[in-house]
Amino acid sequence: MSSVVVVGTQWGDEGKGKITDFLSENAEVIARYQGGNNAGHTIVFNGEKYKLHLIPSGIFYKDKICVIGNGMVVDPKALVAELKYLHDRGISTDNLRISNRAHVILPYHLKLDELEEERKGANKIGTTKKGIGPAYMDKAARVGIRIVDLLDREVFEEKLARNLQEKNVLFEKVYGVEGFKLEDILDEYYEYGQQIAKYVCDTSVVLNNALDEGRRVLFEGAQGVMLDIDQGTYPFVTSSNPVAGGVTIGAGVGPTKIKHVVGVAKAYTTRVGDGPFPTELHDEIGDRIREVGREYGTTTGRPRRVGWFDSVVVRHARRVSGITDLSLNSIDVLTGIETLKICVAYRYKGKVIEEFPASLKVLAECEPIYEELPGWSEDITGVKSLDELPVNARHYVERISQLTGIPLSIFSVGPDRSQTNVVRSVYA
């Protein structure tokens, strides 16, 4: 048995899709365990660029099983569109498996997400308005509709009618907008269900059988630890658990089955949406990193907020996710910056703190304590090993590993798969 979990150690967008795609070559099963189509990952395959939001990035390999786990929330309309997107490009999806226990995102979830974000005004969370939060709310309130319900027209109609009765009161009385009619949703979404029915099964059986047979299973996290509903910058978080522990719940495998946890980080920090960001840059260096790193959201196209590498954040991620291996991405983006900074701790009211605060009020008042390192100007995009890196680049990478306490296993010097280098195997 060899299982690897890939998690983001920052606020998402660390390049998990690329690393998952890279590690997929040696995996036999690739599974997602939380989130929905709020996560976007870009994969370069055979020179073509693909953008996926729901389907695991291992879909490009016909011999590998790809799993949408029970912990995910699935927008059937978006899933059918993504399947068509792949089919139109000649990519087979016969290797896809969808959990019958995953919850379904319906039009009223999308509407609620949008209205609630508008209502909050200046206090908005910065959601992607994909209905993720409202779908997880229904799941927790035990009124959610699951994939297994979507496939049974009688059950789907009954649950949908019950939910619309409640949601329409909310739309009309609280938000002052028109609700939904049963016929607006029933036929269209039942049909989406029929289009995905052939992929639906109990995915926990698929995953546990694979692990028991000693096959290599890769679990692909979405978002990042700092967006985790329990461990992130609450309430500026997602509604699920991207931490490695989310695998046990969202994929239906026991904690004893997890062997390695790869924490993916950029060599700097980015964030989409609102919330405190201690190392954020509002200067020319920040603008330069954003442009060179093409830091615009895959899902929203929004410019990402950019800052220096924060080892307080990544140490927190290591602790709460049990990270065993570091994958450091986008080192090349920092080429040409004369002096680089790494945040080693925070200063709060004259005191040095090394743990990430739970209070956003405290966090907003924290000043980053920086260690300065000399930059490099050499082109590193063709580098294949640590030894080939310029002295300053290597020192920067090694210092990040030291400060975070995570051994370096993978580093990447460009967006292409060929620019991803293994220092030590995560499947060992």
Curated annotation (Swiss-Prot):
Gene Ontology biological process: 'de novo' AMP biosynthetic process; IMP metabolic process
Sequence positions that bind GTP: 12-18, 40-42, 304, 330-332, 412-414
Gene Ontology cellular component annotations, sorted alphabetically: cytoplasm
Enzyme Commission number: 6.3.4.4
Cofactor(s), names only, from the UniProt record: Mg(2+)
Family: Belongs to the adenylosuccinate synthetase family.
Self-association state and partner proteins as the record states: Homodimer.
Function, as annotated: Plays an important role in the de novo pathway of purine nucleotide biosynthesis. Catalyzes the first committed step in the biosynthesis of AMP from IMP.
Protein name per Swiss-Prot or TrEMBL: Adenylosuccinate synthetase
UniProt source species: Geobacillus sp. (strain WCH70)
Lineage: Bacteria, Bacillati, Bacillota, Bacilli, Bacillales
